[in-house]
Amino acid sequence: MQPHERLDRRVGFCVLAAVLEQLTVLAPGLIGGSVARAARARGVARRIVLWARRPETRLALAEQAWCDATEETPEEAVAEASMVVIAAPVDLIVPLLRQVVPRLKPDAIVSDVGSVKAEISRLGREAVRGGAHFVGAHPMAGSEKTGWQHGKAELFDGRTCFVTPVDSTDAEAAASVARFWRDLGAEVVTIDPDTHDEIVAHISHLPQLLASALCAFLATRDPSWRNYAGGGLRDTTRIAASDTKLWRTILQENRDEVLRALRQFQDELEGFQAALANRDFIEVAARLERGRAYRDKFRPSL
């Protein structure tokens, strides 16, 4: 890839950044739609091409100012792309990559946005050939909402994006993917795929399970109780409104790491239970304080 360069002054000083000749986003939902919006808003790509499976979605996307063209097939969409971002659900990323590989330019770079990385990074690297490259990525910028209509150009601003090369990944390709996400506003962390999956099992996948489990439990109680819910319950369970099919697939793909995290969390719950049962409120307070101290060290909300 031979990107042009541009001067980026959005943070008050000049930095050199890559401008892609063509960015293609396959299967844009919330994240993919935000990638296209951010790329247009920040001048990251001269041309932005999208492909969606449904014809009516392609028609709607073609009307957006941040989309230059849509194609009827993913193969057509990637044919002239410098960078391809596959924004499909995690179980469809590698099959879609294998489908388009024969049409990739020799120097094309393919990435993804999947929230599970070990299997995708390994199989993705094995799938590409002919000079093209695959580098996994995962922006930590989701929402309980789904669909490209909910995308935002500023979705990645200040958010972490994991870039997950494997040992055989081309170093320049990995650097290009990291630069791409920085140009979209993200703070890039380069990490191996297995460590990524362990981390997100604890900080993303486990919270989803807990929010859903709490709502599922409350659904067995008096239905009228939900009418009295205050901010605490609403804040705690916001992500329980997330797409069921999407999360079933994520939990399936990261099953082993999520199970480990669940077992460890169960130990914490049992500690609270034992302290309450034994009327050991000093221990209860200590556990509450440990949780409060951890929460207070979060980065400021963006």
At which residue positions do the language-model features occur?
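Rossmann-like NAD(P)(H) cofactor-binding subdomain of soluble oxidoreductases
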Residues: L96-Q149
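Internal alpha-helical scaffold of NAD(P)-dependent oxidoreductase catalytic cores
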Residues: E154-R238
